Amino acid sequence: MKVTLPEFERAGVMVVGDVMLDRYWYGPSSRISPEAPVPVVKVNTIEERPGGAANVAMNIASLGANARLVGLTGIDDAARALSKSLADVNVKCDFVSVPTHPTITKLRVLSRNQQLIRLDFEEGFEGVDPQPLHERINQALSSIGALVLSDYAKGALASVQQMIQLARKAGVPVLIDPKGTDFERYRGATLLTPNLSEFEAVVGKCKTEEEIVERGMKLIADYELSALLVTRSEQGMSLLQPGKAPLHMPTQAQEVYDVTGAGDTVIGVLAATLAAGNSLEEACFFANAAAGVVVGKLGTSTVSPIELENAVRGRADTGFGVMTEEELKLAVAAARKRGEKVVMTNGVFDILHAGHVSYLANARKQGDRLIVAVNSDASTKRLKGDSRPVNPLEQRMIVLGALEAVDWVVSFEEDTPQRLIAGILPDLLVKGGDYKPEEIAGSKEVWANGGEVLVLNFEDGCSTTNIIKKIQQDKKG
């Protein structure tokens, strides 16, 4: 099955925050200055790139979404260069010009792939009247699906709490890339996206994943957040939401060259995906895939729709994610060459709950790779009745593919996955519940191939049917 990207072209996102211009001067250096013990660089290349909140807006526009950028600049060459660069990539800029301040500019001098010095041209915008920013937000709220507040502690978000309240009143989700340790100022936001260092600076050092979850959930409660996404570098990212099981997503980066701007890519893809009408879980899946692409590039970068599609499709050469049967067979063959034990299970997985997560984690522990085969919508309807599935196949597969325990997800149209299992022939076939091994679809084929069949227990008290009944009862009540 091919994963469909969000309809980015219908997504409108406004980014408000600290905009800046990144300037790079490159050139050879072969001598020391006679004036001081410093290298002399003969500049032969000059590059200018939007930075800070402007880079977030570029990431949104690169997906084909409608990106609007609001921030504070001076009236100078840097502001004009910034506006031109952003217009070239279809970002609509609506800057507030402050004649008493320069546009924030960071100039880096590089030679032989080494940064020799960075020169910052800036004065904090604290104290500047925020009303023009509020007016621009108010004017846009009826036509956007998400508001991103990009905080680099330069003063543009001095009135961040008022901005959050404006968006909440209009029912627009607010996503914030936080700065500093005062998370009180972000109270009421829909989603905060701190990296692990920023998170631990607020809650303290976390030695285990369980501590991250426990302290993250407390932070959500303390600051009335709807969700928290902790980006954890090579350990992937963790999505925490009240009343839901934590969603830990392993990194999808194949190689890491440069993490510069990866956080901007993550929040940009999150916002564009939510604004396109997708769920937060789906948004995190796409953002995680995009981060895996962008860290494989040098310098601040963006991700194109084609790059994102290639990443989330989990093609055989990337070794993860949602796959077609043919792609899965290639991936399994490659895994076997590496001597890996392949485990396979199946199910509907309609409303993912803690019992599912626990079961899949247990199944994954039985080997090196876990395949999850998922009933198609038609198959689910025949199995569960006309009211099911609640979530369509594509959404179910995307969420499963985001789980740390799951390597590959594939769908099947039949009532049982027997044909699919016979084609894959896993080393271990796993099923949850009170089945007898010989009753499990595909067991005969696996045994005939020398494989094993194992029945695992489901966690007590967890049931999709019970969840649906409770929702229906709550609606009636």
UniProtKB/Swiss-Prot annotation:
Alphabetically ordered keywords of this record: Acetylation, ATP-binding, Carbohydrate metabolism, Kinase, Multifunctional enzyme, Nucleotide-binding, Nucleotidyltransferase, Transferase
Enzyme Commission code(s) on record: 2.7.1.167, 2.7.7.70
Region (Cytidylyltransferase): 344-477
Organism whose genome encodes this protein: Shigella sonnei (strain Ss046)
GO molecular function: ATP binding; heptose 7-phosphate kinase activity; heptose-1-phosphate adenylyltransferase activity; phosphotransferase activity, alcohol group as acceptor
GO biological process: ADP-L-glycero-beta-D-manno-heptose biosynthetic process
InterPro entries: Bifunc_HldE (IPR023030), Carboh/pur_kinase_PfkB_CS (IPR002173), Cyt_trans-like (IPR004821), PfkB_dom (IPR011611), RfaE_dom_I (IPR011913), RfaE_dom_II (IPR011914), Ribokinase-like (IPR029056), Rossmann-like_a/b/a_fold (IPR014729)
Record protein name field: Bifunctional protein HldE
Subunit record text: Homodimer.
Pathway(s) served: Nucleotide-sugar biosynthesis; ADP-L-glycero-beta-D-manno-heptose biosynthesis; ADP-L-glycero-beta-D-manno-heptose from D-glycero-beta-D-manno-heptose 7-phosphate: step 1/4; Nucleotide-sugar biosynthesis; ADP-L-glycero-beta-D-manno-heptose biosynthesis; ADP-L-glycero-beta-D-manno-heptose from D-glycero-beta-D-manno-heptose 7-phosphate: step 3/4
